Amino acid sequence: MKSYLKFLLLSLCILTLASCSGEKTTQSAASTEQNKKEIIIGTTVGDFADMVRDQVKPELEKQGYRVQLLEFTDYVRPNLALADKSIDINIFQHKPYLDDFAQSRHLDIMPAFQVPTGPLGIYAGRMHELSAVKEGSSVSVPNDPSNLARALVMLDKLGWITLKTDINPLKASLADIAGNNKNIKLVPLEAAQLPRSRHDVDFAVINGNFATSSGLKFTSALYLEPGYTYVNWSAIRTADKDSQWVKDITAAYNSAAFKQYAFKRFAGYKYPESWGIQATQPASAPAK
């Protein structure tokens, strides 16, 4: 009986020590995250990277952070890098894309705050006027599902194609094209390749960040996407949502200094809804 009691007491001691050790480990991890002073930011090349270099990095460094910028040329690796902790936050995508990617890849990531975003637009390729479209005209479009959907909705508004009426426009696909009277030839490409595709197609649908990084001006667009559904968001790991560094970087992107910088440097962009101001109106579609 005494041996049994000794064994029981020993077991309880071991369990208590293990519990305390686990609690200390959890508290230590939480403390480390709260005291985090190195932030790795991932963006696509171009405007989002410029925002970090010009304004956000200097502001965070004033607060004692060490900031590293990693630039990507595609829309897949930034989210995978975020999920595997190669980076701490990424800035390149709108919410429909983020939601779809996170769900399909089973990633525990979430939106944090909006950032100024260049609108999707149709730019001249071999043809320089929308009215020049003809039978068999070619149009390069983004090949990722959410941005392809945006392009299809734009072409539908222009009357170049007709989409089914009972679809979710945020998820429109090639299979949802109900009519193509002009036999428009769609050429899906990675978004980063779209500016260079203009020499090979009649028109190109180009994302705002890649348009500006290739030297295109929004004023040269033949048509700009209306609405603000696709203003881009930053993305973080869900576990980090209450971290102090997330609060600090959010504040940096919403500071008066950053807003003034954005209004001057990125005139014509669509700004975060929380700012309560939009500088431009999108080009309107011609009558069908």
Where would I find each of the regions flagged by the language model?
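C-terminal motif of bacterial Sec signal peptides marking the signal peptidase cleavage site
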Residues: 15-19
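Bacterial lipoprotein signal-peptidase II cleavage site
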Residues: 20-30
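Short, polar/charged alpha-helical segment
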Residues: 38, 45-68
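Short helix-initiation/N-cap motifs at beta->coil->alpha
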Residues: 69-80, 167-196
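Ligand-binding "clamshell"
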Residues: 100-112, 127, 200, 205, ...
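A conserved helix-loop-strand patch within extracytoplasmic ligand-binding domains
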Residues: 112-162, 259-260
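A bilobed periplasmic-binding-protein/Venus flytrap-type ligand-binding module shared by bacterial periplasmic
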Residues: 119-130, 230-245
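Periplasmic-binding protein-like
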Residues: 149-156, 253-274
